Each structure stands twice: as C-alpha cells, then as structure tokens.
C-alpha cells in the first residue's frame, strides 16, 4: 500500500497529501460492490468532488479498481447512471477494510460485497484469458430492482445474479425473473456461495466452485 501510494501514484498524479489519499483508497475498499457516490466519498475523505473523481480515475488506470458501467437500456424505467466500484483484488479490499482473519469474513457486513467482488473479478479474468474484454454492465432501476452483471454477447443478453448465501431461497431469483421479462433474455445465471450447481426454470445455478463454468457462458 505504501509503495503503491508513494511510488506508483506519484508517477500518475500529483498527490500532495499522501495520508488523505491512503484514506481515500481505504474508503473505496469499504465501498467495493457499491454504486459510486463521489459526493459521499469526497465528504468522508475531506476532499472536493473533483479531487475524488480524479483520484478514482487514478485507481482505475493503475488497475486497483474496476468500474462496472450501468446497462444503458431502460425498458421504460428510470435507471441508475453511476458505475459500480469493484476492487480488482478482493483480498486487498478486505485487508484495507480491516478484515484480518478469514474466519471473521463470513459474519462481516462486507461478506456479500466481497463475494460479489470476487465473482466479478473472475468474470473479467475469464475474458482476459480468452483475449477479449467482456462487455459487462450492471442494471438497477429507480425502484431498486438490480441485476449484478448484465453481459452482452453480441445480440444476446446474459443477466447474472451473485449471492453469497450457501442456501438457495426464492428471493435469489426475483431480479432475474423480472429482468428476463423486461429484456427478453432467454436465460439467467445465478452464482451463489453454496456447492450444488443445477438448472432451474430459466436460470442456470452455479455453486462458487463452478464459477469458471459460469464465466464461460458470460464471456
């Protein structure tokens, strides 16, 4: 962290207050898996909105974070327009957020966000391993209905939901069902923290160990 701030960042942008920048990076880590709110981020760090925007661009350019853009089609709904923030390394995000023991992760408030961060990272990694940049987005309307990842494979949409829970419950499928009805997507994917992979009506379910199989259907 210190090496990154003091050496790499200074090559990209003139950061005068290194302590504040370190705080900014930590605040970003606690927001992994969330829609970017630059005003809130700036206020928490005591910096201006423009500075927060510039520093976030630095983190993205140095591959510390990835910004997942919103899917552009609204299907008659008002949409969230800001991107979602993901740390490229979920382990680093956990460490910066103060999580030091693997055993404490399961009960930590960030466990779901970190699991989602890991899955999104695996999808992006799968695309890179295939020599292409996958067209990944997220979708959320003003009513709060959200799809964690919407993949565009040519003209085909593949909605993906990510749930950290180990037991499947009906609520896990609600967003996928709604999005498929709005978009006409034929099939959705659910990646969850359990072990069993299976097929449900209109949804392929993958346990976390099968994330590579799921990624092959996305990228």
Task: Locate the predicted segments by residue.
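Domain-level recognition of nuclease-like catalytic cores that cleave nucleotide substrates
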Residues: 193-219
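Switch/connector loops and helix/strand junctions flanking conserved nucleotide-binding motifs
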Residues: 95, 169-170, 197-201
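Short beta-strand/turn micro-motifs composed of small residues
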Residues: 140, 191-192
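Structural signature of nuclease core domains in nucleic-acid processing machines
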Residues: 155, 183, 203-205
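Accessory nucleic acid-recognition modules appended to NTPase machines
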Residues: 1-157
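Short beta-strand-loop-alpha-helix junction that forms the active-site gateway
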Residues: 153, 162-170
């Amino acid at each position: 962290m210190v090496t990154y701030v003091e050496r790499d960042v200074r090559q990209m942008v003139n950061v005068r207050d290194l302590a504040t920048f370190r705080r900014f990076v930590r605040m970003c880590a606690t927001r992994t898996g969330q829609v970017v709110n630059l005003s809130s981020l700036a206020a928490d760090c005591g910096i201006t909105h423009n500075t927060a925007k510039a520093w976030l661009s630095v983190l993205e350019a140095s591959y510390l974070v990835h910004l997942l853009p919103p899917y552009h089609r609204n299907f008659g709904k008002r949409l969230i327009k800001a991107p979602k923030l993901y740390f490229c390394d979920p382990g680093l995000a956990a460490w910066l957020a103060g999580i030091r023991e693997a055993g404490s992760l399961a009960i930590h408030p960030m466990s779901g966000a970190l699991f989602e961060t890991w899955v999104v990272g695996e999808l992006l990694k799968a695309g890179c391993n295939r020599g292409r940049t996958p067209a990944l987005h997220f979708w959320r309307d003003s009513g709060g209905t959200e799809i964690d990842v919407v993949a565009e494979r040519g003209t085909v949409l593949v909605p993906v939901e990510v749930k950290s829970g180990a037991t499947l419950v009906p609520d896990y499928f609600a967003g996928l069902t709604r999005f498929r009805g709005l978009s006409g997507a034929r099939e959705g994917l659910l990646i969850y923290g359990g072990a069993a992979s299976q097929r449900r009506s209109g949804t392929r379910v993958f346990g976390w160990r099968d994330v590579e199989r799921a990624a092959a259907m996305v990228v």
